[in-house]
A protein has these predicted regions:
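Short glycine/proline- and aromatic-enriched beta-strand/turn motifs that initiate or cap beta-hairpins
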Residues: 22-75, 239
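Predominantly the C-terminal beta-signal and adjacent terminal strand-loop region
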Residues: 29, 178, 189-240
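Outer-membrane beta-barrel channels and translocator barrels
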Residues: 35, 85-87, 142-146, 192-194, ...
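Residues that define the transmembrane beta-barrel architecture of outer-membrane proteins
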Residues: 36-40, 72-76, 127-131, 147, ...
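Transmembrane beta-strands of outer-membrane beta-barrel proteins
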Residues: 38-44, 92-96, 131-133, 149-155, ...
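Transmembrane beta-strands of outer-membrane beta-barrel pores
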Residues: 46-50, 98-102, 155-163, 204-210, ...
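Repeated loop/turn-to-beta-strand initiation elements of outer-membrane beta-barrel proteins
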Residues: 50, 89-92, 145, 195-198
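Flexible, solvent-exposed loop segments that connect beta-strands
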Residues: 54-69, 102-128, 161-176, 211-225
């Protein structure tokens, strides 16, 4: 935990140093960049994901399971991007990403009166690797020297590449759907350096469809009516 905190602090200082350096720079780097009809880049980031669940009537009516809570862990994000100029202030961006190392968890507390042959505390882990395909519109501010901010809004389609894995399809496990759709919003800023543009970005994603593949006869699945995904992502874009 402390290592992660120190990494975040160091990252903030590094980004702040670059901002100061760019702001102090009199010479405007890559001054013709805004005239490009399109440009490409690469993305490296980290995401914090979680699941929002609605309990079913079965869970409320019965007490064989006392607690049922979903959770999820973060993962490393890598990808490519293509950005296209629409107007002076508007750009369209396609940013396909692979989210690696994440997992989704389901924690249960069973009622000992009805579950004498099972541990009271249960956890089901579903390894997850996701292909994310977001399409976004960027609203750019005016450029000040080598610095510019922007707002971002868009939609995305996610494909769970682990959905058909053996670990995800064991008998009795809760199952999630392969496809997920959502909306996104974010904020970022461009730091125009001598040979490339560094773009830190913070984005939130809100899944709109139910990703639970509900099985009424499976007690670990039947306690949920619906599950939706949520994500917060910090990214560094390296743009040409």
């Amino acid at each position: 935990m402390y290592n992660l905190l120190w990494k975040k602090i160091i990252l903030i200082f590094v980004v702040s140093f670059i901002v100061v350096e760019c702001s102090a720079q009199r010479e405007q780097y890559r001054s013709q960049h805004d005239d490009l009809p399109y440009y490409f880049g690469a993305t490296l980031g980290y995401n914090l994901s979680y699941l929002s669940a609605k309990k079913s009537e079965k869970f409320l009516a019965e007490d064989s399971i006392l607690v049922a809570e979903p959770a999820a862990s973060g993962g490393v994000t890598i990808g490519l991007q293509a950005t296209f100029k629409l107007t002076k202030r508007l750009q369209a961006r396609f940013n396909p990403l692979i989210v690696l190392g994440g997992a989704r968890y389901f924690n249960y507390t069973l009622n000992s009166k009805y579950n004498t042959n099972e541990p009271i505390e249960q956890r089901y882990t579903l390894p997850t690797t996701v292909l994310s395909l977001p399409v976004s519109i960027k609203f750019n501010s005016d450029r000040i020297d080598n610095f510019r901010t922007y707002l971002l809004f868009g939609v995305k389609a996610d494909v769970d590449l682990s959905a058909n894995s053996t670990a995800r399809n064991q008998e009795g496990y809760i199952k999630l759907k392969k496809y997920n759709y959502g909306v996104e919003a974010g904020v970022g800023f461009n730091l125009f350096l001598k040979f490339f543009t560094l773009t830190p970005e913070l984005k939130i994603s809100y899944g709109v469809n139910n990703i639970l593949d509900r099985e009424p006869n499976l007690k670990y699945s039947a306690v949920f009516e619906s599950i939706q995904s949520r994500m917060i992502m910090f990214s560094l874009h390296f743009e040409d």
